[in-house]
């Protein structure tokens, strides 16, 4: 039996195929991969808009600093640790980064970025995401073998595009795939 070759998907986007038949969180989801190693993987779903929040009240920014509300959408990044918030943002903002990628994206998770966004000094593009998605060692590779995910290069214009409900269909279109081409049978040909 041959050893499987490991391909690092950090900085890539996972596109759920229709084979992710559950109507839950992963159905038609898009996941930006933060880290993918032989020890497992972590990602953020970026097309599950769940609500809007006032940054001032959510992050308890001092009232005297900001006079008006700054409402931002909240995305559900996955089923793990919903009390953790992340900003997936353009690389033009580089203060206290949690993760820095070579594809013009970064991740921050601190009060400073929320204050900078509230003052109009934050990144040009950002998504506020609560929670994350994680896989155990080998789990993501197994799901890829079962055709549950497609992999595409990251495109920040795509990630930050309006209308999150259309992003999954647009991802398939970007990959040249019509949803109708997927068989109702799960498996490999």
Swiss-Prot record:
HAMAP family in alphabetical order: UPF0301 (MF_00758)
NCBIfam families cross-referenced by the UniProt entry: PRK00228.1-4 (NF001268)
InterPro entries, per database record: AlgH-like
Protein name listed in UniProt: UPF0301 protein RT0098
PANTHER family to which the protein is assigned, alphabetical: UNCHARACTERIZED PROTEIN YQGE (PTHR30327), UPF0301 PROTEIN YQGE (PTHR30327:SF1)
Family membership noted in the UniProt record: Belongs to the UPF0301 (AlgH) family.
Organism name: Rickettsia typhi (strain ATCC VR-144 / Wilmington)
Top-level lineage group: Bacteria
Classification via Pfam families: DUF179
Gene Ontology CC: cytosol
